[in-house]
């Protein structure tokens, strides 16, 4: 695909970490790209595997960097996890290892927090991760709770270097229990289908922009989108 064919796409789905920003630093060319999207009436969605922040918090983060983008342009793996449970297990209970972005998304769809006998153990990115939490999760999974992780990223980029991401956090629980987690974020096709639905475009009308071959590019290719790999992450 050449550049003109890419420019002709109606919709653009973009990763965030390593594509739009690195930590709290906006990456070069992003402001111009967003201006081009708006001036050419392109439909666009920032689709992040991170589950830490809500769309409102992501909007505010970009606003602090000088980008004024509506809250409706953000979709996270936390929202994808919540939507999955709302459809597959309405009224379920969960023990959650995660940040407020994940907890609030689950609460909004009626998931009840339960650290005694939950239906699910759900793992997302969080700084509040310790041996006690791992032990609790392991015992709950061994007692029958199903294991879900918000995404399969092993690491994530920051302005200080690489940091452990969700798959690194769920791995000890998998190893100790012998159970494999079900990963919700990219490249899970459920998340990509939701992204296309939110944009209101078909896969052949959209492009995926990301910095990871194992999630962003694979997600785009498997869903029939044109893919763009950037090397900024």
Task: State where each predicted segment sits.
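HAD-like aspartate-dependent phosphatase fold
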Residues: 1-16, 20-233
């Amino acid at each position: 695909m050449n550049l003109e064919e890419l420019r002709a796409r109606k919709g653009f789905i973009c990763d965030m970490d390593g594509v739009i920003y690195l930590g709290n630093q906006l990456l070069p060319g992003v402001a111009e790209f967003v201006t081009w999207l708006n001036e050419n009436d392109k439909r666009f969605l920032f689709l992040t595997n991170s589950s830490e922040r809500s769309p409102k918090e992501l909007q505010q983060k970009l606003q602090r960097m000088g980008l004024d983008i509506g809250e409706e342009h953000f979709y996270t793996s936390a929202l994808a996890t919540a939507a999955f449970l709302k459809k597959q297990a309405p009224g379920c209970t969960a023990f959650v290892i995660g940040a407020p972005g994940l907890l609030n998304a689950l609460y909004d769809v009626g998931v009840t927090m339960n650290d005694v006998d939950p239906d699910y153990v759900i793992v997302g990115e969080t700084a509040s991760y310790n041996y006690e939490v791992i032990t609790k999760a392991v015992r709950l999974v061994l007692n029958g709770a199903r294991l879900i992780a918000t995404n399969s990223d092993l690491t994530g980029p920051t302005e200080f270097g690489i940091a452990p991401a969700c798959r690194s956090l769920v791995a000890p629980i998998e190893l100790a229990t012998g159970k494999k987690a079900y990963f919700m974020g990219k490249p899970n096709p459920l998340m990509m289908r939701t992204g296309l639905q939110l944009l209101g475009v078909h896969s052949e009308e959209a492009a995926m922009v990301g910095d990871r071959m194992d999630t962003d590019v694979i997600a785009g290719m498997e869903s029939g989108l044109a893919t763009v790999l950037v090397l900024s992450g």
